[in-house]
Amino acid sequence: MSAGAFRLRALARGFVRRGCRVRVVTTTPPPSAPPGAVEEPGLRVSRFPVLRDRGGNVRGYVQYLSFDIPLAFRLLFARYDLAVAEAPPTTGMVVSVVSALRRKPFAYYAADVWTDGVISMGAPGLVVRLMRAMESAVLRRAASVLSISDEVTDRLVELGARRDRVATVGNGVDTGMFSPDGPAKDDGAPYLVYTGTMSEWQGAELFASAMPAVLERHPDARLRYFGQGASEPAIRAEAARVGDRRIVLGGVVPPAEAAEWIRGAAAALVSIVPGIGYDFARPTKTYAAAACGAPVIFAGTGSGAALVRDHGLGEAVDFTTAAVSDAMVRAIDAWRSGGGEEERAARAAWVQANASLDAVGTNAADAVLAAIR
């Protein structure tokens, strides 16, 4: 499951806890996906197939349309009182138009700012203008907009959202799934782990580029990636150069398995490419790692770095190969020296108290329901 899937499941559960009947309209998972969870009481899931890229992602205009067009017809003939849409803004626009035709309220869950995302990828000016127009229209029309941080809220208001309609509900992780309690992987040697999406704006290949310097100090160390994304080709190329399976791409794994790898790691790796419009981001993988007790190495600046630094979740460093490799070496040194149990417990306790996804989901559901009453 992606961070977005966890977030939406928490929202759906929040609605169920408030006595709502919830229907989730989503995609049929790709064949490579791990088995999904069974349906829960009060929550019905409807799936239909979509076009995907070679990596199994719903990524690109044609792929989005393969979801959005059938969605429009499903919403036109479905019985509902309220719709909640998540990004991309193309999906938000479909929900906005159908809801207007049917005179139903809708909410928009803005975990990311897509206009900034397409700018960071170097998209043509026309694409940026179209994305900005769609995102702004959706934000203006939504009865409620859910934001994950104050920084995202400010950016949403700049794009046209009414501040009094934006609820900053925070972000978090499933602390039942991601916790220090449970089995931990043993790789026979120290390893560092990156879990989740490897997009252009995360720059996950930076850690692979740092591995040669790490191996000079710790020749038996290994770097493991779990997930998928645009950085995979660059990571595979670096893995081939390093050789000896020192850098391993493990694909998409179930969340429970990801938690096992995190628990056993010398450190969990998180990154945001600075200066491309995503410095406000606080990746969910930071919370997941800290919830398992693992120290976080965050490469980048802005809100994500402050989160790690201010709450003792690990180490925030510059987005450079030298800074990252030094931090990775320090993490392995600490792992070899043993101990650190108090720090692991403190990290997990902070997430439990401040970033439980159950609490986020309930707060989000309450904000949406309050907006339509």
Where are these regions (language model features)?
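A charged, aromatic-enriched C-terminal amphipathic alpha-helix characteristic of glycosyltransferases
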Residues: 319-323, 336-368
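Conserved donor-binding/catalytic core segment of Leloir-type glycosyltransferases
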Residues: 184-212, 224
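Nucleotide-sugar-dependent
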Residues: 202, 254-261, 268-290, 297-307
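Carbohydrate-associated surface elements
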Residues: 28, 151, 172
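N-terminal subdomain of nucleotide-sugar transferases
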Residues: 1-46, 214, 358, 373
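Nucleotide-sugar donor phosphate/pyrophosphate-binding loop at the beta->alpha transition
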Residues: 63-66, 104-107, 115-138, 175
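Nucleotide-activated donor-binding/catalytic signature segment of Leloir-type glycosyltransferases, i.e.
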Residues: 189, 233-260
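Membrane-proximal helix-turn-helix segments that form the acceptor-binding/catalytic region
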Residues: 13, 72-73, 79, 93, ...
